[in-house]
A protein has these predicted regions:
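Extracellular ligand-binding/catalytic regions of CAZymes and related secreted enzymes
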Residues: 59-70, 250-499
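Juxtamembrane extramembrane loops of integral membrane proteins
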Residues: 1-134, 342-343, 381-395, 412-414, ...
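Short, functional N-terminal and low-complexity linear motifs
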Residues: 24-31, 64, 137-144, 322, ...
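Acidic, S/T/G-rich, low-cysteine, solvent-exposed domains in lumenal/extracellular/periplasmic regions
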Residues: 67, 83-371
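Conserved GHKL (Bergerat-fold) ATPase module
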Residues: 49-50, 89, 105, 167, ...
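Detector for methionine-enriched segments
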Residues: 8, 17, 142, 172, ...
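Short low-complexity stretches enriched in small and charged residues
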Residues: 28-32, 78, 196-201, 236-242, ...
Length: 499
């Protein structure tokens, strides 16, 4: 604990540490790692919710301090906002992580050259590639480049952004086919057994098969929304294929066109269950062949000379869901003032993508030993708590936002405070502290209310399971035994009379 306005607090703030409230006091509990050459890395606040990821965080920090320079990656996202600073984007959390761990280079749509010093290109929902860039990317791969495509037959993020349902991108299917990957852009994959329960217009909860959980090759739980499916094409002897993620063995699909204006209830009715596994993420490695028979940009000064075949091993990975990277599919909470180490994930989507980029770039970063569990692994108490929290979700979000705003205001005031400040400034800080304390108490009261509601549900569940249900079954058993015995006695009496 640090006393307010003390030299220790000023030092913590100047180092970039962020406080978090504990009862009515503020704690500064961060971590700064300093390398021998003077370079440093900072975790502004060690959040208890991220304790399972601490080993991974420290490993990445130490690995980064040992690197002479960051690995350079390129981001190509012509249709979805994905700025490296992570602002104003549905992918803000992933953008912040990429900015922290790599040197991020944004690739313009009209680029005629993808520099070979870019270790990995991340193409997010590229759609129909501009002809010039398509050639540049092709020649980048011919020279041993690595590309990660996030494609989508029905991007819900793009739907929300443009205001109308998107159409499938058949062009990407043709582009990827030349590199040995069959992308089924016209159909959306689903999994009923791992699907999420959603509330319909009639108030009833149903399993929506197009929103589901899957597991990666390392067992990490991954969340998908309306993904496509992939298949390794035949007759590509120079390529090695690896399945990175797939549905279970009892999956199905639906035509992408059918879900554009349909309700979730109608989608459930039209869904085709065929009990076949579908690959959701696929990696192809080896020597690829070019899409082109000649150099279409030979006269351009910036373009690479044409190569018909790859001169060294390259890699192309495809994830058939661009929404896979969006915050909504893997972020439980996020602290805007701590954009990297304030992210609390509930799914392994970002860890999957970071691990894939590390794998392709040759970065030997050890994956986290502990990954978030899928909701299906939650126990009864957690499930009841989530149901109670859902009823008070809007109220809790309001209190969360209010408490975060008052905490941010208080930190700004403290950070700008100097020894020469007058009494009125200190009183302003005291008022901000009192306001923040009231907001925290209101938030704590609401959390206690949620917990109490969950306890009541749990008590009712226990009463039903261990008292009412067993008593009912016991009563039914005795009643059945009584009527069976009486029937047998009547039959015996009837037989005696007949004798």
């Amino acid at each position: 604990r640090i006393k307010p306005f003390s030299d220790m607090e000023k030092q913590a703030v100047s180092e970039g540490m962020l406080p978090f409230p504990e009862n009515e006091e503020e704690l500064y509990f961060g971590l700064k790692v300093i390398a021998a050459d003077g370079r440093s890395a900072l975790i502004p606040a060690l959040k208890p919710e991220r304790r399972a990821l601490l080993e991974s965080d420290l490993n990445r920090i130490l690995h980064g301090l040992n690197e002479e320079r960051k690995v350079k990656i390129g981001v190509f996202s012509p249709r979805l906002p994905f700025s490296p600073d992570g602002k104003g984007s549905a992918f803000a959390s992933l953008a912040a992580l990429l900015q922290e761990y790599y040197e991020v280079f944004e690739i313009p749509a009209g680029s005629s050259l993808v520099p070979q010093d870019i270790s990995v290109v991340l193409a997010l929902d590229p759609g129909r590639l501009p002809p010039v860039f398509a050639y540049a990317l092709d020649q980048y791969v011919m020279r041993g480049g690595k590309v990660v495509f996030l494609v989508d037959p029905y991007s819900e993020v793009r739907h929300a952004l443009q205001g109308y349902p998107p159409r499938p991108d058949a062009e990407m299917g043709e582009y990827l086919k030349t590199w040995g990957i069959d992308y089924h852009a016209e159909r959306v994959a689903g999994d009923v057994l791992r699907g999420e329960r959603v509330k319909g217009g009639d108030g009833r909860y149903r399993v929506y098969p197009l929103w589901f959980w899957a597991k990666g090759e390392d067992g990490r739980p991954l969340r998908f929304h309306t993904p496509g499916s992939l298949l390794a094409a035949e007759n590509f002897a120079d390529l090695h294929f690896s399945e990175l993620a797939a549905t279970g063995g009892q999956s199905g699909d639906i035509a992408a066109e059918k879900i554009r204006y349909a309700s979730k209830t109608q989608v459930i009715l039209d869904y085709n269950q065929d009990n076949k596994k579908r690959v959701l993420a696929l990696l192809a490695e080896g020597k690829f062949r070019s899409h082109y028979r000649g150099g279409i940009l030979d006269k351009a000064k910036s373009a690479q000379p044409y190569l018909p075949f790859a001169v060294r091993d390259a890699a192309v990975a495809v994830v058939a869901d661009s929404d896979f990277a969006a915050d909504e599919l893997w972020v439980a909470s996020r602290d805007p003032e701590n954009p990297v180490y304030g992210i609390v994930p509930y799914a392994g989507n970002a860890a999957f993508l970071l691990g894939l980029i590390d794998r392709l770039s040759g970065r030997a970063v050890v994956p986290p030993s502990v990954s978030p569990e899928a909701p299906g692994a939650a126990n009864i108490a957690e499930t009841l708590y989530l149901k109670s929290a859902e009823k008070l979700r809007e109220e809790k979000e309001k209190f969360d936002a209010k408490e975060a705003a008052s905490s941010a205001r208080l930190r700004r005031l403290k950070k700008s405070l100097t020894d020469s400040e007058d009494v009125s400034r200190r009183r302003e800080i005291e008022r901000a502290e009192n306001e923040n304390r009231r907001d925290r108490k209101a938030l704590q009261n609401l959390e206690r209310q949620i917990a109490a509601a969950a306890d009541d549900r749990l008590e009712l569940f226990v009463w039903l399971c261990f008292v009412v249900f067993p008593s009912g079954m016991l009563g039914l058993f005795f009643a059945t035994a009584f009527f069976v015995r009486r029937r047998v006695r009547r039959q015996m009496m009837t037989l005696e009379k007949e004798k």
